[in-house]
């Protein structure tokens, strides 16, 4: 966003769900290992960047691929845009091809980014620049990790834990 005296730039590097392994579920909502960045507190972002507000930050409960071991869940982050003419740029991956499962595991959910504007949903590409207007709601969904092994081999205990935690099999 161009503010008085120059540009006000916010940069965030998103991770997502990691793939499952032969003995464990994938990690949920993990930052990219290559970014050396941490999860920034929402309050810090909003105090430093007055052009948006975070209105949702949640796990995508059905984004991890089903399997003997479940792929990690991605997350959703939604921003309410507070000013006109805010430029949003994205450089993402796994928008078209889902993260694959292995040895019978299901794929994780694909990533997506879209803008809700006046009752319309504007789907954005994985690599795109877009101008946001006041009142727009920007939604970023990161992908889930692929599952490992056949879903019917998932232990009863792990299924019970999934149910208790509100995690469902990937149906995306």
Which role does the model predict for each range below?
Residues 1-172:
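Glycine/proline-enriched, intrinsically flexible loops and inter-domain linkers
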